[in-house]
Amino acid sequence: GTGRAGEAAARSFVSIELGLDIAQCNFRTREGEIDIIAKSGVEYIFFEVKTRTNKKFGSGVEQISARKALRLQTTGQRYLEQIGAENADWRIDLLSVEMDKTGRVQKVTHVENAIEEQS
């Protein structure tokens, strides 16, 4: 589906545009899943990939809800524990992939620390 094409586009964006090393894709635990985990120097970046096919859903770049962010955080923590890097710095970024109706990727938008502020 569009999700898969979106994730492929997101992966090449991370390695080519951002020039980062991808450590793992689709890392899953009981708590959740992280689409892409990359490393930037000593910092780990947990990427959430959102794919959408049309502009109707608001063209402003979305944020990650606080609840979802918490799941990503817990999942990310698990990943760091597994690789023996639980004290590493990390952040959660968003990759928003926009596609046209034929499923071609139009644009990838990268938002650092894309978590909604809790009111």
Question: Residue spans of the language-model regions?
Answer:
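Active-site metal-binding core of divalent-cation-utilizing nuclease and nuclease-like domains
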Residues: 18-46
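Feature marks short, surface-exposed loop/turn motifs that line or immediately flank catalytic pockets
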Residues: 31, 53-55, 98, 117
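Active-site donor-binding loop signature of nucleotide-sugar glycosyltransferases
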Residues: 27, 49-51, 113
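Domain-level recognition of nuclease-like catalytic cores that cleave nucleotide substrates
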Residues: 82-119
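Residue-level signal for inorganic ion chemistry
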Residues: 14, 72, 92
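Mid-chain, well-packed structural core segment of small domains
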Residues: 57-88
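Acidic-basic catalytic patches of nuclease active cores, encompassing PD-(D/E)XK
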Residues: 1-24
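Conserved catalytic cores of phosphodiester-cleaving nucleases, focusing on short active-site segments
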Residues: 36-57, 72
